[in-house]
């Protein structure tokens, strides 16, 4: 029995080697076609092979071939063909119900980074990639994928979209460094404190207390226009500092007095008090309002920020909640 099992294993290994060798030969032919400029023919052959492999349940071979093909087309400036094969990479992951792994997330982020930032395919790709990476949990996507997307968007100086993805990652330090660059290159000197205040409040609304603390500490230490603190010259920064301490303590009276004392600073952005209402519920036991007083844009923003995090009150999670609309 043992000998038979060993022989079967050896045969399987030989078949696997032959299959991989076959894939490599096919890849070589396809690469030669692309190098010659026969883009259309090569693209159609990639698609044909994809569906053939998928019908034979060779999901890994299909995915790896589409990934290498996408990179090849990107290197030759063939955006449409590359984007199409990138979608097929996702299709293989979805249909085979492949488990999330760091290497796969990095491959998806690599493809994303090579796509034309203005292409509609990129929007579709990132939406599907995040959905797959959530593993059917109903979350907003894997924090690691969000981090990788945020880093790419930061390099492209797409700060608003980068901030969105950082908020759903676990990378508070990266978020802070991006916000420092965002503030110094695009913001007004008078708004230095507002960049980090919004991020901290939104992290807290997503029950990510750890990243909220890291983003505040890193930002205030590294921003060239912020003097050493605490305490800080800017009242809003002092409020955020006290708020983070209060969240750790969990005392409602401290939170209430803090919000009352700093109302002049909090009135600088109408969303601050909306965020603080939610933070009061999450960390200080404040009961939800019976009837929502939020309407229009503010109501939509708050609803989209809270999302599924309302269903879970006990644990911190960087991926809780629904998408945050960023201005």
Curated annotation (Swiss-Prot):
Gene3D superfamilies: Tetratricopeptide repeat domain (1.25.40.10). InterPro entries: GET4 (IPR007317), TPR-like_helical_dom_sf (IPR011990). Signal peptide: none annotated. Changing residue 122 to H: In CDG2Y; uncertain significance. It is found in: Cytoplasm, Cytosol. The modification N-acetylalanine is found at residue 2. Residues 307-327 are annotated as: Disordered. Residues 195-271 are annotated as: Interacts with BAG6. Changing residue 279 to M: In CDG2Y; uncertain significance. The modification Phosphoserine is found at residue 12. Changing residue 258 to A: No effect on interaction with BAG6. It comes from the Eukaryota. GO terms for biological process: ERAD pathway; maintenance of unfolded protein; post-translational protein targeting to endoplasmic reticulum membrane; protein insertion into ER membrane; regulation of protein stability; tail-anchored membrane protein insertion into ER membrane; ubiquitin-dependent protein catabolic process. One of its GO terms (cellular component) is chromosome. Changing residue 241 to A: No effect on interaction with BAG6. The keyword Phosphoprotein applies. One of its GO terms (molecular function) is protein-folding chaperone binding. Keywords: Acetylation, Congenital disorder of glycosylation, Cytoplasm, Disease variant, Phosphoprotein, Transport, Ubl conjugation. Disulfide bonds: none annotated. Belongs to the GET4 family. As part of a cytosolic protein quality control complex, the BAG6/BAT3 complex, maintains misfolded and hydrophobic patches-containing proteins in a soluble state and participates in their proper delivery to the endoplasmic reticulum or alternatively can promote their sorting to the proteasome where they undergo degradation. The BAG6/BAT3 complex is involved in the post-translational delivery of tail-anchored/type II transmembrane proteins to the endoplasmic reticulum membrane. Component of the BAG6/BAT3 complex, at least composed of BAG6, UBL4A and GET4/TRC35. Interacts with BAG6; the interaction is direct and localizes BAG6 to the cytosol. Interacts with GET3. It is linked to Congenital disorder of glycosylation 2Y: A form of congenital disorder of glycosylation, a genetically heterogeneous group of multisystem disorders caused by a defect in glycoprotein biosynthesis and characterized by under-glycosylated serum glycoproteins. Congenital disorders of glycosylation result in a wide variety of clinical features, such as defects in the nervous system development, psychomotor retardation, dysmorphic features, hypotonia, coagulation disorders, and immunodeficiency. This is Golgi to ER traffic protein 4 homolog. The lineage of its organism: Eukaryota, Metazoa, Chordata, Craniata, Vertebrata.
